[in-house]
Regions:
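Terminal targeting signals and extreme-terminal segments of soluble enzymes
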Residues: 1-135
Length: 135
């Protein structure tokens, strides 16, 4: 490991592994509003497990989408681990869909809110929101 004016520079592999080590920070309530014109169209909300992670430095200060997907998988996986017992096989990823609605800023942490949509006998479903600046 070497150092720079701003602090230690990690080996790229060490840095990637460090980025994937998310910090659990508790839970939050996520609400979903319907269209503004439709009165009473509030879609309700759900509770979510919340994790925080940082980004690898990237050109132009943007977050690499693959990093966000990997962090989302880690966050979702941490909400499934507690379901497995000694008799049950570990749950593996079967399907992943990602939508990038806004660019991310690599200089700010990302908050991952994981909604537990379903926990059945054979599979679980999760929705992960990657949030910066409240959006």
């Amino acid at each position: 490991m070497t150092t720079s004016e701003t602090g230690p520079i990690l080996d790229p592999l060490e840095d990637l592994l460090d980025v994937l080590d998310l910090l659990p920070v508790g839970s939050a309530h996520i609400t979903v509003d319907g269209p503004v014109a439709d009165e009473g169209s509030d879609l309700g909300g759900s509770d979510a497990d919340v994790f925080i992670g940082r980004s690898q430095p990237m050109p132009h200060g943007r977050v690499f989408g693959g990093q966000v997907l990997a962090q989302s998988v880690i966050a979702a996986g941490r909400t499934v681990e507690d379901l497995a017992d000694a008799k049950e096989r570990p749950r593996r990823i079967h399907s992943l869909h990602g939508y990038f609605l806004r660019p991310g800023d690599s200089n700010h942490r990302i908050r991952f809110a994981v909604e537990r949509l379903r926990d059945g006998h054979s599979f679980s479903a999760r929705r992960v929101h990657a949030i910066q600046f409240g959006k």
